[in-house]
Swiss-Prot record:
Name of the protein in its database record: Keratin-associated protein 9-4
Function, in words: In the hair cortex, hair keratin intermediate filaments are embedded in an interfilamentous matrix, consisting of hair keratin-associated proteins (KRTAP), which are essential for the formation of a rigid and resistant hair shaft through their extensive disulfide bond cross-linking with abundant cysteine residues of hair keratins. The matrix proteins include the high-sulfur and high-glycine-tyrosine keratins.
InterPro entries: KAP (IPR002494)
UniProt similarity note: Belongs to the KRTAP type 9 family.
Species assigned in the record: Homo sapiens (Human)
Top-rank taxon, per record: Eukaryota
Record key words, sorted: Keratin, Repeat
Residue ranges of the region described as 15 X 5 AA repeats of C-C-[RQVGE]-[SPTN]-[TASPF]: 8-152
Subunit structure: Interacts with hair keratins.
A GO cellular component annotation in the UniProt record: cytosol
Length: 154
C-alpha cells in the first residue's frame, strides 16, 4: 500500500508511537509498504528533525551530512561517534579518521572526539564550542567544558 502514511500517524499503517517519537515529521512520510514506516528506509530524510531517539541516531544521524544538520544534545543515549553508533573503530585512536573529528563534531578544525589524535583535530580540541553538542555530547569531561566552551554554548 502506498501513501498510507500521509498523515503518518495512522496506527494501522505506521504505528503511532513510531511516527510521533522517531520520525517527528508525520506529513513527510508517504510510504510504508514493506517495512515499518519509521525505519531509515522510510524516514531517513525526516527522522532527524529533530533526532530524539538512539535508534534514530544510530541508523541515520551518524552520516556527516545528517549529524551537522540535525543531531541534538539529547538525541543519543551515547555520543554519535561511539561504537554503538558509528562503528567499532570510531573511538580508537589508531583508526579514528579525521572525518570523525572534523565532520561529526560540527567543528571544521578545532574539536576532537575522545580517541581522536590531536594531530588530526588540532591542538585546541574543545575551542571554540559553538553548539550545545560540544558541551554535552562531545567534550564529556567537566574540565574541558568549563575551560573552553563559550557561555552562550553551554
Amino acid at each position: 500500500m502506498t501513501h498510507c502514511c500521509s498523515p503518518c500517524c495512522q496506527p494501522t499503517c505506521c504505528r503511532t508511537t513510531c511516527c510521533r517519537t522517531t520520525c517527528w515529521k508525520p506529513t513527510t512520510v508517504t510510504t510504508c509498504s514493506s517495512t515499518p514506516c519509521c525505519q531509515p528506509s522510510c524516514c531517513v530524510s525526516s527522522c532527524c528533525q529533530p533526532c530524539c531517539r538512539p535508534t534514530c541516531c544510530q541508523n541515520t544521524c551518524c552520516q556527516p551530512t545528517c549529524v551537522t544538520s540535525c543531531c541534538q544534545p539529547s538525541c543519543c543515549s551515547t555520543p554519535c561517534c561511539q561504537p554503538t553508533c558509528c562503528g567499532s573503530s570510531c573511538d580508537q585512536s589508531s583508526s579514528c579518521a579525521p572525518v570523525y573529528c572534523r565532520r561529526t563534531c560540527y567543528y571544521p578544525t578545532t574539536v576532537c572526539l575522545p580517541g581522536c589524535l590531536n594531530q588530526s583535530c588540532g591542538s585546541n580540541c574543545c575551542q571554540p564550542c559553538c553548539r550545545p553538542a560540544c558541551c554535552e555530547t562531545t567534550c564529556f569531561q567537566p574540565t574541558c567544558v568549563s575551560s573552553c566552551c563559550q557561555p552562550f554554548c553551554c
